[in-house]
Amino acid sequence: EIAQCLVGSEMCIRDRYYLHYFTTETTKYHEALPDILKSYDPVTGLWPESPGYALGTVSMLLDIALMLKSNGIDIIADNPVMQKAALAVFPWIDEQCNLIVFGDSRGGSANFTMFENLLTYYTLTKDEDNIKKIAAALNMGINSGNYNRSKSNWTGLCTYVRSIPQVENIETERMSYSAHHRMITMKNYNGNNKMMALLYGGKKGYHLSANGLAMQLYGFGYALAPDAAGYESYWSADVTYHQSATGSNTIMPGYTEGEIKINAMEPMVDSLSYTNSKELNPYINFADVTAGEKRRMVATIRTSDETGYYLDLFRSNLDNNDYLYHNLGTSLSLYTKSNKELKLTSVEDLGVTYSKGYDYFANPRKISYKDDFMVHWKNDKSPISMCMWMLGAENREIYQVDAPYTTLNKALTPGEVSTPPSFTPTLVVRQNSNAWTKPFIGIFEPVKNNKKSVESVTALHTENNFIGLIVASTNGKKDYLLHSIDNQPHHLKGNLSFSGNFSLIREKEGQIEMLYLGNGSLLKKGNYTIEATNNAYVSIYKNNGTWYYSSDSEVNVVLAGKKIHLSAGYNQEITF
C-alpha cells in the first residue's frame, strides 16, 4: 500500500523522487520493489503463503506496473521474477478459473484484474504467446460466469485493451510442484471431461495448515473432494475442524505436517522448474509421495475424451488408521460389489477419535465390512456426483458421517451443496490393523446423470509391497494397474510381470493398445514387453492405429512378438 501511494504521488506531481523509493531504495518504513521480490520463489514465482495471499500481492504490484508502463517505465522487464510471479497462478486455478483451496485460503475466482493488466502489458510489448495464454484465461472466466468485464471500474476503462482476443484452447501444464508449499497439481485437460487432482503435505506457518498427506479430486469444474474451508474466522471454534487434517482427505492419526519425499512423478517436474516440460502420453498422470509413516500414490487416468477415473493408493505404517474422504453432495449410499445396498447402523459416536475435529462429525452410522464395496455420493441439486470403488481388507469398519459444510462460497459447489446450512457427506474407513501391508485402494469416477464408465474393479494382489488391480470400463477397455514399493520383479498369472513404481497395461476387446511404465525396468504381458537397464519412464501407445512411444532413456520393447530398440524421445512414431 505504501508502494502504491509512492507511485501515485509520482504520477500526480511528476517527481521522480518518490519513484526512486519504490524502484530502488528500501527504508526502515518500507521495502522497495527489489526487496519485495526477494520473497518470491525464484523457481516457481510463488509467494510463500497460501493462495489468497500468494497471488494477491503480485496483483497489487501489477496495478503499479501498468501505471508505470504507461509512463515509459517497465518494471516487469527489469524484474523477471515479477512476470514469473504473475504467471504462477495458472497451475493453481481450475477449469473455471477458481483458485485451489488449501491452507487458510477459501478459494473463489482468480483475480481477473491481474489478467487484464497482463493482457495490456503483453499487448504493449507484442508478446503474442502470452497474449494467447492470458486471453484464454479471461475468456474462460467470462464463459464460466466468474468474470463480467462490463463491471470494471474507471481505471479498467482507461487501461484495459478494447477487446479480448478469441483464441483456441491453449495447452495446459500437466503437472506442477511447489516444494515450499508441498503441493502437487495434476491436470489432464485432453478431453471434454477435464480431470484435475491435488496431492499435498501439511505445513505450519505461512497461512498453511497441518492437513496431513491430503488429496483433492475434481470433476466437471468443481473440487468434488475438497479441503474444508467453511470456517467462520480464525478465532471461531470451527477452525479446529476446517483448519486441521480432519477437514482434509487423508489418514488419521499420524503425520499431519512435515517434509515430503517424491518417490516418483510423471509428467516429471525437475528441481529447476515449476511445471512439466514433457509427458509420456496424453492419458496418465501420477505422483507417489512419502510423508512420515504415510505413503500415497494418486493417478489420473483418462479412458476417452469423455471419461476417466482416479486411483488413490494410500499406505500408513500404524496399527490403527482412519481413511477420511469428504465429497460434495446431499447424501451417500454404500453397495456391495454385486450392487446390493449396505445398511449401516446408527451409533452414538465413532468410539476412538484422533483430534478435536472429530467432534464436528454428526449422525454417525457404522458397519463392519471386509469385502470390496462401492459408494455413490448423490446430489439432488445437480446432475454431478461421484462414485468410488474400494477394495476390501480384514479388520475394517465403515462409518458414514455428516461433516460440516465445506465452503461459504456457493459458486464453488454444484447446486450450492455442502454450503451453509447443509453438510458434507463423508466416509470414514477404519482399519484396526497395519495399513502399510494392507493399504487403502480406491478408484474414483466423477459422473453426470449417473452415467458411470467404470464397470468393475477387481483385485489381482492387494497386500505387502505389491498391488495389482483391474479396472474394466463400459467402452470395452480393461486397465491393469500395478504398483510396488520394493523395486523387485513381481509375476502374476496370465504371463504378467512388472518391476517398478507404477504401470498400466490397457487392453481393448482383448488387444493391447497401451503399456505405461513409471520409474521401472520391466513390464510384460504376453507378447508385449518394455525392458530397461535402469529404472525409466516409458510409454508405448496406439493412436488411430499407429504406435507411438515416449521414453526418458534407451529401452528394448517387444510389440506383438517383434523386438525393437528405442532411443530416448517423446511422442515418436514407431516404425516396424
What are these regions (language model features)?
Residues 378-474:
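Beta-strand-rich recognition/accessory modules
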Residues 76-151:
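C-terminal, helix-dominated tail/subdomain
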Residues 134-139, 143-352, 434-438, 442, ...:
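Catalytic and substrate-binding regions of extracellular carbohydrate-active enzymes
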Residues 327-395:
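Polysaccharide-binding surfaces and accessory modules of carbohydrate-active proteins
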Residues 1-8, 13:
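Single conserved hydrophobic/aromatic residue that forms the stacking wall/gate
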Residues 10, 14-28, 65-83, 122-136, ...:
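Structural helix-adjacent loops and short alpha-helical linkers that scaffold large soluble proteins
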Residues 427-438, 445-576:
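Non-catalytic terminal regions with compositionally biased, polar/charged low complexity
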Residues 17-45, 81-98:
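Long, well-ordered core segments of solenoidal/helical folds
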